Amino acid sequence: MMPKLKEELRTIFNDYGLKYVFDTNSQEIKVMKEKKPGEIFLIPFHSIADTLQRMIFYKAAIESNSKSALVFEEPEAHSYPPFISKVTQDIIQSDRNQFFITTHSPYVVNDFLELPSDKLAIYLVDFRNGETFVKRASDTEVQEMYEYGIDLFFNTETFLR
């Protein structure tokens, strides 16, 4: 596994008194809790919180790809908002890949609105009269979205005219 990702996972799990381990025999990620000296409790990957599973997936995808187009559908789904910012910040800092992200989260959108306009394109999608309608937001509209902040998803009709 990638050293930077390993270290970040160690830090995150350490905050909860847990240790992230990679079982080289089974090739599985596990979480370990030391109950007392010489006694451990192993938690299989599928049993850890959805937020942590998803964060590991997205971070591994970002770090293990280069010169790729990565498509993430609703990375905020089943995740605790503060942890999602750990993923969005990795996306923002990555200059090795191109990203396509669908979201219904104002937290995700607000993180990306910090990007310069030449690094960001926002497309709004609607369903009208049985047809899908897609519109790219202009730079002016993106600036307005930045100013609306959390209210963006309550004002989408403003941008879908």
Question: For each predicted feature, which ranges?
Answer:
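Phosphate-coordinating catalytic segments in nucleotide- and nucleic-acid-processing enzymes
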Residues: M1-N65, A69, R128-R161
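C-terminal lobe/lid and adjacent interdomain/linker elements of RecA-like ASCE P-loop ATPase modules
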Residues: S85-R161
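Conserved D-loop-proximal element of ABC-family nucleotide-binding domains
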Residues: A77-P81
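Walker B catalytic acidic pair
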Residues: E73-P75
